[in-house]
Amino acid sequence: MSSKETNKSALPENESATSTNLSQTSAERIKALRRQKIDVEDLIQKILDGNKTALSRAITLIESQQKKHNSNIKTIIKSCLPHANKSIRIGITGVPGVGKSTFIESFGLQLISEGKKVAVLAVDPTSSITRGSILGDKTRMEKLVLEQNAFIRPTASGESLGGVARKTRESILLCEAAGYDVILVETVGVGQSETAVHSMTDFFLLLKLAGAGDELQGIKRGIIEMADAIVINKADGENIKAAKNAKVEFNRALHMYPAKQNGWSPKVKLASALKNEGIDKVWSMISKYFETTKNNGYFEQKRIDQNKFWLKQSIEDALKKNFYQNETIKKALPEIFRKIEANETTPFEAAEYLLDLLNQN
């Protein structure tokens, strides 16, 4: 018997068949759930009772692109709104490889050990090619996902940042209504996603790694300005010395920026999420921030300003969507693009023409 035949005969065929059957059963169960008529009032009550399944289903509705769900979504959010706005919203950013998932898991477990309920969401406007997600498989946070007081939700991806951000913000409200005390919003750490997360959270945390004296290279000025704290992760073993040097460098850089309106001076902390070192100090620092900003009134004012921002953003998104879905505009665009390519018109003149065309309808 050949080695290939030997290997083939050694496969656990029964186990494979069982796995296939389980997958088919799960798929059929999901399809059946989707076919069920949505009992909105029941769903709302279950969310308020802290039911994770109901919360997941409501967020799935929010992420839906189908117009038939719009009415239900509005009802759910409106009913949950009076029970929201009671959590601490923390944005966490950092480039890939900085250890965000490990940090979030360690941080989440620390919060749960102190009696908190933790929800983890993500803002990840990934391309339609990969359709990936920051969080991806929940097994990346295998300890946290098993906790009764934890809720982890990879965001829908493959669409515009505006769409993902709006849905994430609405998901925050639902998580708060479901009783979660701390909402962690993770971002991919590239593009404009940090700005979106900053506009929907109370505290913005930047994760960094210690390098070889080039810690400040490649960091966008805006990220430093937004950060309420910088945590140098993986500060353990042989990295300790480099991490301490990086801390000095970041502190020096932060002092060059003007004081913030919130009365808070951004801090730099060392941590090792893998070894669970320094995580408690990060939470103590964040708790101090909330004490400071609630006492001076900045916390409430920032929430109000964020709501105004999202009002304007929602109007802009709706106008943009209506513009591109207009049939007259759809028909006119190819010719406009041709004229721009041929240098027969300017983008500004073309835009004015299209807007006039829209107003005539």
Model feature map: region roles:
Residues D39-V98, T102-S193, M200-L207, G211-E215:
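Nucleotide-state-sensitive switch-loop elements of NTP-binding domains
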Residues L55-R57, L270, K281-L358:
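Long, well-ordered amphipathic alpha-helical subdomains in the mid-to-C-terminal portions
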Residues M1-R35, W264-Q306:
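Intrinsically disordered, low-complexity linker/tail regions enriched in Pro/Ser/Thr
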Residues I134, S171, A196, M200, ...:
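Alpha-helical scaffold elements adjacent to nucleotide-binding pockets in ATP/GTP-utilizing enzyme cores
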Residues V40-Q45, V98, T155, V231-D236, ...:
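Short hinge/gating elements
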Residues A229, A235-T292:
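Canonical P-loop GTPase G-domain recognition
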Residues V197, A210-K241:
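Flexible active-site lid/hinge loop adjacent to a nucleotide/diphosphate
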Residues M1-P82, K330, P334-E335, A351, ...:
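Non-catalytic terminal/linker segments enriched in charged/polar, low-complexity residues
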